Amino acid sequence: MKIGVIGSGSFGTALGSLLADKGYEVTLWCRNDSQIESINRNHINNKHLPDFTLPEKLTASKDLRTVVQGKDMIVSSPPSHALTEILREIKEYLPEKVPIVSASKGIENGTLRLVSEIFESELPGKYHSYLSYLSGPSFAKEIIQKVPTIVSIASRSETTARKVQEIFSFLYFRTYWTPDVIGVEVGGSLKNVIALAAGVSDGLGFGQNTRAALITRGLNEITKIGLKLGADPMTFLGPSGMGDLILTCCGGQSRNRTVGFRLGKGETLEQILSGMNEVAEGIKTTQSAYELSQKLGIEMAITNEVYKMLYEDKNPKEVVKDLMKRDLKREGVLV
């Protein structure tokens, strides 16, 4: 089996490494010449994962057509804000009747489209039943280190979901399939917003009580907007919901939590982003999530406060104070 992976960041590389580890021939799309040379000659992604040796069956190419054309499966893992442009470029030579697996997380700025809506808008209908979406608690470095990991595979086609499930499942990588595309996407996108808040809390020196509160109320917000969009509430108790939320809010490898932590320590967003090698999706997603909550008429207190902190320069200490001063609520209802 020949597989093309679009995106050479840490997660795309990790998924490509997993698939190559299973014996598949994997071609990774990279824009950077030195990165391509490093992967092909030394089997190291020198830009994103310099400490890990990649399988020999994983190679890299700058030619997007070469990566995509004639492959038996496509894995798409670019930042969500770059997805529309990439799909418009590849659709003329995208193979038909092969699984297309998206691992991108986010809500498109401006259009407020989920990743699945971008795929279904940009690709002809003949591709739609072959689309699937991978999400769950999975740091790239730990996948490469072969740490036992679980994720969700969502597709509106059970045939596609089960096929992708079989292709990805391995000794250290277990997959669960679900038809709930919306739930998997909402959980995978909005957990990054909550992780920013959790990072701020840690940066301000608050304890684990506060982090647990943010995770709990954050899950409430994710579930509310998910239900409004038609998701199955049980999805948010699975790998792509609670699982990913806990990992992203607590794990030291979380880029979004790290951005929040540094904001809590007093750095500006501009200072933080200037030194980052990878995208923290939660920054752009916060804007889209805020606008979507306003459009749908849903109260999302944590999301609103993170938005004010990122885009209106609100002091992180004031964010926490205002969250704690909110009107008292009844537990057990999505409010």
Swiss-Prot record:
Subcellular locations according to the entry: Cytoplasm
Biochemical pathway: Membrane lipid metabolism; glycerophospholipid metabolism
Stated name of the protein: Glycerol-3-phosphate dehydrogenase [NAD(P)+]
Organism per entry: Leptospira borgpetersenii serovar Hardjo-bovis (strain L550)
Gene Ontology terms describing biological process: carbohydrate metabolic process; glycerol-3-phosphate biosynthetic process; glycerol-3-phosphate catabolic process; glycerophospholipid metabolic process; phospholipid biosynthetic process
HAMAP family, sorted: NAD_Glyc3P_dehydrog
Recorded name of the encoding gene: gpsA
Family: Belongs to the NAD-dependent glycerol-3-phosphate dehydrogenase family.
InterPro entries recorded: 6-PGluconate_DH-like_C_sf (IPR008927), 6PGD_dom2 (IPR013328), G3P_DH_NAD-dep (IPR006168), G3P_DH_NAD-dep_C (IPR006109), G3P_DH_NAD-dep_N (IPR011128), NAD(P)-bd_dom_sf (IPR036291)
GO cellular component, one term: cytosol
Keyword tags: Cytoplasm, Lipid biosynthesis, Lipid metabolism, NAD, NADP, Nucleotide-binding, Oxidoreductase, Phospholipid biosynthesis, Phospholipid metabolism
